[in-house]
């Protein structure tokens, strides 16, 4: 397999994985954007909307809408950040329970998928993705 074919497979797999996350979110009765916002907040309590939009490639207005809805449902609270414009997002107790209820089964699926391929293959995926991402980032920023 040549480099072009390898890259096409990498891109196809990334897109398919995103599609599967969309499918799971829909099955759980929420949007992909809501699920990814919950996921981001689970990984980094106190994350800002800006960090979610940049790190998770979600539209700014969409993240704002999701956060406002989660706030309306009393699942999150906002606290002042370093500057007054940016608010840090935290789960409330009921929000943490909601996120665990929604994300817990997803985490179990992810874990079972990794177990199915074995620890060596899982580590190879992690190592390969980290190396490819770093090399791709260098190429994208070369000369800029």
Name what the model sees in each region:
Residues 19-62:
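N-terminal helix-turn-helix DNA-binding core of bacterial DNA-binding proteins
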Residues 1-8, 32, 47, 57-61, ...:
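Residues at secondary-structure transition points
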Residues 65:
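DNA-binding alpha-helical recognition surfaces that contact promoter or target DNA
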Residues 1, 119-144:
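C-terminal regulatory/oligomerization modules of transcriptional regulators
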Residues 1-28, 97:
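N-terminal leader segment of winged-helix/HTH proteins
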Residues 68-127:
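Charged, amphipathic alpha-helical coiled-coil/dimerization segments
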Residues 28, 55, 71-75, 116, ...:
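Residue cluster at the C-terminal edge of the helix-turn-helix DNA-binding motif
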């Amino acid at each position: 397999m040549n480099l072009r074919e390898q890259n096409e497979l990498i891109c196809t797999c990334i897109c398919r994985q995103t599609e599967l996350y969309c499918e799971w979110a829909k099955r759980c009765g929420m949007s992909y954007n809501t699920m990814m916002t919950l996921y981001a907040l689970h990984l980094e309590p106190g994350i800002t909307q800006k960090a979610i939009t940049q790190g998770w490639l979600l539209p700014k207005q969409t993240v704002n809408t999701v956060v406002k809805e989660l706030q309306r449902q009393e699942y999150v609270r906002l606290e002042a950040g370093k500057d007054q414009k940016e608010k840090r997002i935290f789960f409330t107790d009921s929000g943490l329970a909601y996120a665990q209820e929604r994300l817990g089964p997803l985490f179990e699926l992810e874990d079972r998928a990794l177990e199915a391929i074995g620890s060596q293959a899982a580590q190879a995926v992690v190592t390969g993705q980290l190396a490819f991402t770093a090399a791709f980032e260098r190429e994208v920023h070369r000369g800029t």
